[in-house]
Amino acid sequence: MIVNIKKLNPKAVIPFRKYKSDFCYDCVAVSEEELAPNVWKYKLGFALQPSLLLKNTVKGNFDSNICFTLRPRSSVWETGMVLSNSIATIDEGFIGEISAVFYHVMPNMPRYKVDDKVCQIHFDVCVDIEFKEVDTLEETERGTNGYGSTGR
């Protein structure tokens, strides 16, 4: 699959996977800006757009939207930082610079710096759905058992 990428900063690094089996692609920060106390914005230095081939391959004969998601890296715990909206959605029509905003919730821990891998990017497809209001839902094995219902 092909995704068009435009470098907006000469230091931009094209997202990459270390291992073929990796699910997401690592993204490297090219700049940092403190937006508010302990709120940091990291620009990635590029813009993305799904290629026409990718759109046609994925969409096929059904109506769907393509997006990319930014996700925290598994090592984020070492920084005391939290991606501001946990998973950021980048809609197919957005062609601006991709950036990630983090809250530095544990300021005594180190935070990300320029040239660090700060997040991961993933490709997703959203098929159009219609919500249908009903009076009852079909019974399931889990039922209404919520938080913690599967045990430890």
Identify the residue ranges that each predicted region occupies.
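DUTPase catalytic domain/fold
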Residues: M1-R152
